[in-house]
Amino acid sequence: MKLWEKNFEINKEIERFTVGRDREMDLYLAKYDVLGSMAHITMLESIGLLEKDELTQLLAELKNIYRLCERGEFLIEDDVEDVHSQVEMLLTRKLGDMGKKIHSGRSRNDQVLVDLKLFTRHELKEIADEVKSLFDELIQKSNQYKDVLMPGYTHLQVAMPSSFGLWFGAYAESLCDDMLFLQAAYKMTNRNPLGSAAGYGSSFPLNRTMTTELLGFDSMDYNVVYAQMGRGKMERNVGFAIATIAGTIAKMAFDACLFNSQNFSFVKLPKECTTGSSIMPHKKNPDVFELIRAKCNKLQSLPQQVMLIMNNLPVGYFRDLQIIKEVFLPAFGELKDCLQMAAYIINKIEVNEHILDNPMYDPIFSVEEVNRLAAAGMPFRDAYKKVGLDIEAGQFTPDKRIHHTHEGSIGNLCNEQIQVLMQQTFDDFHFERMLKAEKNLLG
């Protein structure tokens, strides 16, 4: 069944090519198509395009379809083009001509837009929850190991004293900034495109404010042409947020792989969290971090993939935009999987509390000695030269006590302030409006 079907049949090869993976991708959107339809028909009844009894029956049947989606039993039949057609067909089978009325004042263009926005904001909430969970694990580890020193590096050369408190805490604070990107993406997403129809509005007296409130959007995409222009732009902006989070996790995974190697031995994974080799019986490989790194590096390409699909399109709808679904919709599950696994493995990771007992790391205390001499009155440059010559002569015996007390340093991690930043950003999403609207629609 095709919503646009007339008195001729399309070539089967053309149909195969143009439908592509739409049925597969549209399963991500199914329950959101139902929610959008529930809001739309409620509005249609309010402007006299549906009778009250018709609305009651349609809403009841849409709730049944929603339950099918929740149970994973909703399917798009082989001869049906997309999720919108499948939902309308199920309603028509059950309720006859009543089911054919739900498309009044609507195009598949604004229908898929609202589906994508409802899906995306839900997924952004789930990602925010997972980011917060990983953040909490990192802060806990930072506090647990705040006094355990490790070498800091520049140019992959040992540089200055650092600590596991700083290392874990640095990635926690990075996630705070990443959440700002996520929040901006959420705010741009959480606007109602419904009522823009094919991109030029409708002659029906649609009440767009009503559907905005019913669906729990913050506001609407006011200009109907811009609503359609937003297709692809939303995905690109969300893609940047996903890529930013993925960048933090990929870097952390790289560090962990490096620190887990025998040449570093800074951290250790429990053996049940490693994999082995088919030929080398001693191997305990950090595959989990390697796969997190690879998956997150792939996710960092998402905004570029979206841009390359849409960057030469003029105003209006084009079928090119369908291809964005194939890279965009699965990305949320991939990122959530990486976040969940990262939180799990960070919880299990063990740290070496005696790294700096090895004299090979003594030079990292050189700056501490320079500063001590400078504080005692020696000119800084003279102190710098003296310590450098002592190291070259093998005469440097460092005092390994650390005296860092300023904000954000080894002795003053500022984890409490970082936690406040994260909580403020998380609270500013205001997910409760979205959740309340969905609950009200479903009764």
Model segments located where?
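A helix-coil-helix interface module used to build multimeric assemblies
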Residues: 1-201, 206-212, 219, 275-276, ...
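Glycine-rich cofactor/substrate-binding loops
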Residues: 1-36, 97-98, 265, 280-443
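Generic, well-ordered alpha-helical scaffold segments in large soluble proteins
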Residues: 40, 61, 65-68, 90, ...
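A general structural motif at alpha-helix termini
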Residues: 58-59, 215, 271-273, 360, ...
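Alpha-helix capping and helix-loop boundary segments enriched in small/acidic/polar residues
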Residues: 103, 108-111, 155-162, 166, ...
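Short amphipathic alpha-helical segments with heptad-repeat character
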Residues: 117, 121-128, 132, 139, ...
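Conserved helix-loop functional segments at active or binding sites
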Residues: 144, 181-184, 188, 217-224, ...
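Acidic, glycine-rich loop-and-beta core segments that form the ion-binding/anion-interacting portion
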Residues: 215-303
